[in-house]
């Protein structure tokens, strides 16, 4: 019982420091100061230690790590900045974001529904504000945040709720829950609401074969099928940062109209392949790589609580 209580307190303290206190402090400071602090923290091996060490070991098996120390630094930096961005999105204006944000490409003109699709890579929160500024409402897709599954992890549960609330506020629409099936998603699209999601989620079913990093792999095809049925375009996007300055870049791909599912899946895979080759340390889901690269049954793979967030 004593060990259990001690471990629980240790987990809560880690969440308090890594997801609340330090990210909020960095977000409250002028960016040139805040990011300097973020870089210093990212050089500390104790920061996100368990997650980064596990990620590094898996990524090395897939041959994407040239410099382990650099990879670990960038992993820690992306984890930290991802949490900082929640507070920046809550507290900072569009004008502030524009000073630190470059955009390559444009969201499609008009206000018609689309599926904005990415992967758990980089620091994508700022893309939400960009999409909303284009005049579109969107609903983030999410797993349900079950309080019982967060037993003994109150701060992590509150963090997940805060993150979901920010997606709702920015998108001006409630979340749509993956577990409710495709009908709520289809209704949202038919009502002119965009969907925002990532497709590198293991264990959801409907996987189709693709090639990633010159290996056989698989990715879920549900969003591709949904876009085809709803006759709405898919727009792939990615957000990453300059690790030296913290400046972000949003890449918006041309709209993809699904007429051939296999071709659409290959397009999705090529987008992820580019991400993994460009900045492999930016992928937050290396822990689930074996499920995608056919080294494990994806149906048996479940998201860790720390990854059950809508964006």
Stretch-by-stretch model annotation:
Residues 2-124, 161-166:
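Membrane-anchoring hydrophobic helices of lipid-metabolizing enzymes
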Residues 75, 112-177:
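Catalytic core of membrane glycerolipid acyltransferases/transacylases, capturing the structured
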Residues 108, 133, 137, 177-311:
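Non-catalytic C-terminal accessory region of glycerolipid acyltransferases
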Residues 56, 128, 165, 224, ...:
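Short glycine-/small-residue-rich flexible loop motifs, especially phosphate/cofactor-binding loops
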Residues 43, 114-115, 172, 209-212, ...:
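Short, contiguous strand/loop micro-motifs
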Residues 98-104, 172-179, 256-257:
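Short acidic-hydrophobic, aromatic-tinged amphipathic segments that line or gate anion-handling sites
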Residues 51, 123, 159-160, 181, ...:
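Residue-level preference for nonpolar/small residues embedded in alpha-helices
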Residues 1-2, 311:
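Non-catalytic N-terminal targeting/anchoring module and adjacent flexible stem/linker
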